[in-house]
Amino acid sequence: MTALGALIKRDIRIALRVGGGALIGVLFFLTVVVLMPFALGPDLALLARLGPAILWLGALLASLLTLDRLFMADHEDGSLDLIVMGRMPLELACAAKALAHWLAAGLPLIVATPVLGLLLNLDTVSTSAVALTLLAGTPALTFTGMIGAALAVTLHRGGLLLAVLVLPLSIPVLIFGVAASQAAIAGPSSFGAPFSILCALSLVSFVIGPFAAAASLRHGLD
């Protein structure tokens, strides 16, 4: 197994164990979606209209909740220093850690979306559209959030700084994710533009995120 594959497998295994963060994100996502019908009342039409936004907001907050452990656990046990000084390019290591985080914490949210959509009175087409937009957009949340996680890892009260840094960068993803979901529900003809922008945001974050995170780690750990 290559060093890259070993790093991804290790991070997934750590995230999936008790206290690793992946389960916390899924439970938080479930809690947000389950509580919303009680807060909005028995209006099923209102639930269906707000359903995509609720699912996207829950996914955003759940992702933010687990991002603080992206580098923190490695920093606490000293393995982050080994990663920084290792032979593998740090940018590639950051990309591998972000991919492992998305597989462990982001992908389960997408899998749970069709079931949770039933609680929001969404039909099969609507839940499928939301799941597709989450599949395209949640990588942007992870790779953008990785930059904030790298900046916060060496700072006191880094979790608060992480929220301040990541939330503004996540707003475009949230806007176009909800817009694409609503467009797919309204009619497929208007789905292409916001969905294409959402995919572009993920691709841009995939390119920029590892380099920005690696630079932050090098500067913070010097």
Identify what each model region corresponds to.
Residues 1-25:
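Aromatic- and glycine-rich beta-strand/loop motifs that create alpha-glucan
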Residues 19-41, 56-59, 165-176, 202-209:
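Hydrophobic alpha-helical transmembrane segments of multi-pass membrane transport/permease proteins
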Residues 39-50, 114-135, 181-195, 220:
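Membrane-interfacial helix-loop-helix connectors in multipass membrane proteins
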Residues 51-67, 71:
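Long, hydrophobic alpha-helical segments
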Residues 64-84:
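Transmembrane helix boundary and interhelical loop/hinge segments in multi-pass membrane proteins
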Residues 95-120, 140, 144, 177-178:
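Hydrophobic alpha-helical transmembrane segments that constitute the membrane-spanning cores
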Residues 128, 133-167, 218-222:
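A structural motif at transmembrane helix-loop-helix junctions in multipass membrane proteins
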Residues 205-222:
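Junction motif at the cytosolic side of a transmembrane helix
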